[in-house]
Each structure stands twice: as structure tokens, then as C-alpha cells.
Amino acid sequence: MKILVVSDSHGESADIIKLKEKYANETVAMIHCGDSELDNGDPALESYIYVRGNCDYDARFPNEVVTNIAGYRFFITHGHLYNVRMTLQSLSYKAEEEGAQIILFGHTHHVGSELGDDGVLYVNPGSILLPRGRKDRTYAILEIEDHTIHVQIHDHAGNLMKNLSASYQMR
């Protein structure tokens, strides 16, 4: 099973529409981790699970979402309310509180993934519009196979970035 994860599109709806069309038949879920800068109900966000980022001014967006997908409990947030620029510790506490096994977040515009000592998988898909730390605009595909999660990072054109992708054995 595959899950599309995108973040920080900052008003650029064409990219998230293109990704939605590309992956609609391949994924069980599509997630936007905030800072879409679109209105709640915008057609570009249709089919996405989405949260509010620090640049989203529509108060109807949820700050966070907890949901079960493909047998895993996900906690989805933008990250600005959890100080993710400095540490993942607050997210770790929230994961424990929510019983989450996978945390998806954005905000930093830095792409990355890691399996914490707490057994929680942390994934930041980077920014589809304004990357930091590298020039590549990115998004993630999570491919779930039993107890293995493959975090596949793709550039804006859809090319797999093997050096940023990783597989994690979940407990």
C-alpha cells in the first residue's frame, strides 16, 4: 500500500493537483502536512487529508489529524506548534500520547526520515515549492509492506532520490 505525503506548497495548487492525478490510483491516502495557503474546501485539496500550517489562515483547517491507515496509527501535523526546527522531542511525547507509530510533518522545508529510539517513524517530505538545505523540491511516497515501511523521496519531476530514501522495520 502506498501513501502520498506532501507539504509546504505555499499557494501553488498546480503541483498538488498534478500529484493527486498521478497517484490517485496507486495510493490508499494522500496527505498534505500544511502550509498549502489554500482555502478549506479548495478543489486542489480534495482527496487529501490536510492540516493547518503557520501560513494557513483558514481556521477551519485542523491543527492535527490522528488516523489509522494500512494498519498503522498516524499523527499528522505541520510541526510549528511542536518546535520541530529545534527538536523532535515534543512530537515524540505527542506520539506516545496518541499511540501513533508514524508522524508526518513539514514546516522546516528539510526533507528527511528517521526511526526514533521510541520506535516511531518520523517523516518530513520537505517542500514541494520552497526547499531548504538543498535545491530539490520534494515529496514522499510511503510504501507499506507488512512490518516494513519504505520512505521513497521523489523530486518535483517524480524521480526517485535513492540517497534520501530509506526502509524501516517497524515493531
Regions flagged by a language model, labelled:
Residues 51-54, 60-103:
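Helix-adjacent hinge/juxtasegments
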Residues 15-16, 85-89, 134, 159-168:
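A short, polar/proline- and glycine-enriched secondary-structure boundary/capping micro-motif
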Residues 66-68, 113, 141, 152:
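Residue-level detector of beta-strand face positions
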Residues 2-70:
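Core catalytic region of metal-dependent phosphoesterases/phosphodiesterases
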Residues 7-10, 34-36, 54-56, 79-81, ...:
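Active-site metal-binding loops of divalent metal-dependent hydrolases
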Residues 2-8, 73-80, 121-126:
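Active-site-proximal beta-strand elements of phosphoester/diester hydrolases
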Residues 145-171:
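Charged phosphate-binding loop/patch that engages nucleotide di/tri-phosphates or the phosphate backbone
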Residues 49, 84-147:
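Conserved beta-sheet core of the metallophosphoesterase superfamily
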